[in-house]
Amino acid sequence: MTFNGFAKRFVIRDAEGMYFVPVADVDRVEADGDYVAVIAGGRHHLVRQAMHVLESRLDPAEFVRVHRSHMVRIERIRRVEPCGHGEYELTRADGIRVTSSRSYREQVRRLLR
């Protein structure tokens, strides 16, 4: 299912079958080996898909990629602090901190405009 060309939900497969995770519930996305962890409501849902594929399915007005291994929901970012060398530390509403990489500094700087 898509909305404006972007995913509205993720289909998660596990040993018991399939279930859905609405994109509206997703807090962040992290690379996890050959999988991507879709984190929603404190639960990690593993998806066997490349990070760049998942990124293309998410609305860039709602999610920003800040590192090769991390994407975060923009509305849940509470603080951005420069760390030097083009890196930033982003603090989310739940207190979790994610450090951006230099490769994604422009994406973080756009958040600050």
Predicted features and spans:
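Conserved binding/recognition cores within well-folded domains
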Residues: 1-93, 97
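Phosphate- and divalent-cation-binding pockets in alpha/beta enzyme and binding domains
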Residues: 107-108
